[in-house]
Regions:
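Histidine-dependent nucleotide/RNA phosphoesterase domain, centered on the 2H-phosphoesterase fold
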Residues: 2-351
Length: 351
């Protein structure tokens, strides 16, 4: 048996990774293919990871169209990146930035915190190198965004008309019943009741404006739907299985047309990279109107992380809030209050 088969040349990929270099007949590359020359010592070359995607895949990223070629033949890309991602992009002592630069053979400049520009600048000798760096930065940002708390949500306001009036009546009836562990702080403010159609992480004005453009891009989805959306709110349910340890109590919402639109919007935004983790992991929006939430309590830690909703469900489980129409969806700021005591609205899709 050939000695070359038993003891083939080995290529070091990293500190703990070694791979055999296959022997190829010279008609198919031979020694040249294996990086060896007959009669000469083997030359050490840095391992270069093969690009399994190709430039065409990177062209799907709109930012790739902004790559510029300089007079000396080099390439440059200015990429908008919110400052909140700078720490993760740089890494401990610059390790992450340095790794991307080495793997893609590019130079990456990250603005300092006191600089006005939010553009990360990527430079390289070849366009494909910039595309590879762009792809890695995009993947890194997606990973970092998953770890961040949501900042905005898509909402249908329910704070007017019959539904709001009936909510006030239900709240009064529950409080008058003087049920153990139930107090006014558990209830959603009457001017803030809403449906949530999506939750996002938007870290600067550029991302907020982009989210509004994506929301407007959902307008064609309305063409095959009947608007305004008719909604009926009837019955009470809880998010968990045990009503004696309830965290969220909500009103059931029936609206087939709104459900279709909400699910289509969810699918659209999942492709934008702006969704919070919860939205990326779901296939459908659960239409519901939150009525009571233990997190609303100022003393939530002292009172425990749940409340007993058994008697509420027994007495008011079939409560009818009436009907409403949805004529707009709003991009709202989480944990905020506008002039009308609803959430601050960044923009809306009217229909």
């Amino acid at each position: 048996m050939s000695r070359e088969v038993l003891s083939p040349p080995v290529q070091a990929m990293s500190q703990n990774r070694r791979y055999r270099v296959n022997i190829v007949h010279e008609d198919f590359g031979g020694d040249k293919w294996n990086g060896q020359n007959k009669g000469s010592k083997r030359q050490n070359q840095a391992y270069e990871e093969p690009d399994l995607y190709g430039e065409d895949d990177d062209e799907d990223d709109p930012a790739a169209s902004n790559i510029e070629e300089s007079p000396n033949g080099d390439f440059k890309l200015a990429l908008h990146v919110p400052k909140s991602f700078y720490g993760g992009l740089i890494g401990l002592k610059g390790s992450t930035k340095r790794r991307i630069e080495e793997e893609t053979r590019t130079e990456i400049y990250v603005p300092r915190q006191n600089e006005k520009s939010n553009d990360v600048v990527i430079r390289g000798k070849q366009r494909s190198q910039l595309c590879a760096a762009l792809r890695q930065i995009r993947h890194l940002i997606t990973s970092l965004r998953k770890k961040m708390k949501p900042t905005h949500f898509l909402a249908v306001a329910m704070n007017s008309g019959e539904v709001q009036k009936r909510f006030v009546e239900l709240k009064k009836s529950i409080l008058e019943a003087q049920l153990p562990g139930i107090d006014e702080e558990l209830f959603m403010p009457e001017r803030s009741i809403h449906l949530t159609l999506g939750v996002y992480v938007l870290l600067d004005d550029d991302e907020r404006q982009r989210a509004l453009k994506e929301l407007e891009a959902c307008r064609p989805l309305l063409a095959d739907l009947k608007t305004p959306f008719e909604m009926k709110v009837k019955g009470l349910e809880i998010m968990n299985d045990d009503p004696s340890f309830t965290r969220i109590l909500y009103g059931r919402v029936e609206s087939p047309e709104l459900q279709k639109f909400a699910d289509q919007c969810l699918s659209h935004f999942q492709g934008t990279g702006l969704c919070a983790t919860d939205n990326n992991e779901r296939e459908s929006i659960k239409l519901h109107m939150t009525l009571m939430n233990n997190r609303y309590r100022k003393e939530a830690m002292k009172a425990g992380n749940s409340f007993d909703a058994r008697e509420i469900l027994k007495r008011f489980g079939d409560f009818d809030f009436g009907a409403a129409q949805c004529q707009a969806v709003h991009l709202c700021v989480l944990k905020s209050r506008g002039e009308d005591e609803f959430y601050k609205i960044s923009g809306s899709l009217q229909f």
